[in-house]
Amino acid sequence: AGGAHRLVLSAGHTVPLVYATLAVFDEAMRARLAREGDPAFAFPDGGRWALTWEHLLDLRRNGGLPGHAEMAGRTLLLKWNTGPSGHGMPPSVGEALALRAAGCEDVKVFAIEGEGGLTPGASHETRNSAWGLGLSNLVFLLDWNDFGIDDNPVSSVVHGDPASWFAPYGWRITGTTEGSSFPEVTRAVLEAARGENPGRVPSLAWFKTRKGRGYGTYDNKSHGTPHPLNSEKFWTTRKAFMARYGVAY
């Protein structure tokens, strides 16, 4: 839809989280349809474009869901093919500029990235160009957890914090040190997207998080490290989930 906000998952390797969210949404729709029988909860075209839990079983397999974000098939909501760090930052500027040129400046472009994605040179050009073009419809959402895949924290090689990374380029800044608090995240996102912006400049919302939270393996060690099936950590993470949501494995 022309008025729908755009999502660029610049941190494209995190796309399994999008898949999981869409699968949960599909389950919720199925449950409402079964309980109430209201066709409003049925997906059009027989669910041709829906992403279900069954699709998760083929993640990163031939013909299954790709491991990086792709604007295709069941993930057309993602407005760029992304994967490498920072890859989606320049096109997010292009998307915001195109929307403004089309008279749709009220449509926001949300780009999600981690601080590691700010290290490529193109990210600096992106931040400067977004301000220079006055892209008030561009909102960056930054996951600030101080780790990528390396043993050394990002802060050991990159100086500063989100404010010092974006304020010199003229951006509006908001954020929270409680990046795992839903109310705090919501507040920061709404402030970035809907807050007063008299200078009509791009906005940043940052979230301080802990990489690996709730997984039992933290920081860079959590990256691409699935727990062995039926191991102690495998069941520890599931027990916490079962206790909170009342489900059983």
Predicted feature locations:
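Glycine-rich ThDP/TPP pyrophosphate-binding loop and its adjacent helix/strand module
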Residues: 74-249
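Cofactor-binding active-site loop characterized by glycine-rich and histidine/acidic residues
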Residues: 1-133
